[in-house]
């Protein structure tokens, strides 16, 4: 588990997303929503990592280049030793599907440069020796979908997402 019962939890996202999140899901105890440009580490100064810190970046890295995610992760490892970063990721095929409309609007041709992983531990783990990387399937890694109340079609979609598109929740301990 990431939470030791004392650590602070930080939700990281772009300011407009955090504003909406604040309306729909206000931060709980020990939790803080941080509106920021993750490419600018000025937000590091807002973090109190004493007692531990867990960072969530949900749905964010699909819009970042792999190099930008690598630099952020290394910077966080420097600034928050003992901290944890949790985010969702997917393979190249899934990222193309997820970002298709956005990429077309932004006139981006090289989708291959955008952050995508198939095997998080193997691919991200090589970025820095301090990183302890684990991942679980986005759907099947956390839920037992064999319950009769779960439709066969939903189970099929979960298998396609987790196995075919390598959709996953990644946890990096610094």
Describe the role of every protein-language-model region.
Residues 1-174:
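Alpha-helical subdomain
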């Amino acid at each position: 588990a990431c939470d030791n019962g004392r650590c602070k939890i930080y939700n990281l996202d772009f300011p407009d997303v955090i504003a909406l999140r604040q309306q729909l899901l206000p931060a709980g105890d020990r939790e803080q929503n941080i509106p920021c440009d993750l490419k600018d580490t000025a937000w590091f100064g807002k973090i109190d990592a004493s007692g531990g810190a867990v960072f969530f970046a949900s749905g964010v890295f699909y819009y970042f280049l792999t190099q930008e995610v690598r630099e952020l992760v290394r910077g966080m490892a420097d600034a928050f030793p003992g901290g944890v970063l949790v985010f969702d990721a997917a393979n190249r095929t899934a990222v193309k599907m997820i970002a298709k409309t956005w990429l077309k609007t932004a006139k981006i041709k090289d989708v291959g440069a955008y952050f995508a992983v198939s095997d998080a531990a193997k691919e991200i783990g090589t970025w820095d020796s301090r990183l302890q990387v684990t991942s679980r399937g986005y759907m099947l890694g956390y839920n037992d979908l064999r319950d009769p109340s779960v439709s066969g079609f939903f189970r099929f979609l979960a298998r396609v997402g987790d196995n075919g598109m390598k959709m996953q929740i990644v946890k990096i301990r610094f």
